[in-house]
A protein has these predicted regions:
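Gly/Pro-rich hinge or "lid" segments in bacterial periplasmic/extracellular proteins
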Residues: 3, 87-138, 142, 152
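Short, well-ordered beta-strand elements
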Residues: 10, 19-23, 41-44, 71-73, ...
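Surface-exposed binding/hinge segments that line
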Residues: 13-23, 56-98
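Ligand-site clamp/hinge motif
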Residues: 132-176
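Sec-exported extracytoplasmic/periplasmic mature domains
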Residues: 17, 29, 46-53, 132, ...
Length: 188
């Protein structure tokens, strides 16, 4: 039905044309151990609108109030799409007390997800299970995400077992895996 479904929140309500009240989920912690409450989200959003080129124009935030698990956002003009914009990847909620560790392609943050980035380089991210993840049991202990410069290198890595899964495999390379029972192809 194309409606936004809250994840870190349990509900949201447009109080009036310039105000949206968001109820945050209880029990969520950042990978740093800090509780994700309205104050933490406020800090993150205030940082976002101060450093991101598009966010101030999309979100139109005048000011934000934090009270426990209730975040109230006041806008300078009606912004009916604000909830959609908050779901944009630039709106990822991170722990600003932890900050951004490193620079550029090596930057790392404390988020709320099932994994913690333990090593970040421009071509690889190593993730380990977040033992304090609020969303249920995390089934895989470690994941390595690699970036490949070209499709041939990606295909070779899959064929040799250097990687166990891919996204963005070149279409003309599907024939190498399509009839092989050792591989499963999922597409949508």
């Amino acid at each position: 039905n194309m409606e936004v479904e809250p994840w870190l929140a349990t509900d949201y309500e447009f109080v009036d044309d310039l105000t949206v009240k968001i109820t945050l989920r209880d029990g969520v912690k950042f990978s740093s151990g800090r509780a994700m409450d309205a104050q933490a989200v406020k800090e993150c959003l205030e940082d976002l609108i101060s450093v991101h080129d598009r966010a101030p124009y999309d979100l139109k935030i005048d000011h934000i109030e934090a009270d426990g698990q209730i975040l109230t956002i006041y806008t300078t003009e009606p912004c009916p799409a604000i909830i959609n914009y908050l779901g944009d990847p630039y709106g990822a909620i991170i722990d600003m007390e932890y900050g951004i560790q490193g620079e550029g392609g090596s930057a790392n943050v404390a988020g709320t997800g099932p994994y913690i980035a333990t090593n970040v380089t421009p071509t690889q991210i190593d993730l380990t299970k977040n033992e304090n993840y609020w969303g249920g049991d995390v089934k895989v202990d470690k994941i390595t995400v690699k970036s490949f410069a070209d499709g041939s290198a990606l295909t070779a890595a899959l064929q040799t077992g250097d990687v166990q899964g891919t996204y963005g495999l070149q279409y003309d390379n599907y024939v190498l895996f399509d009839q092989n029972p050792d591989y499963t192809i999922h597409s949508s």
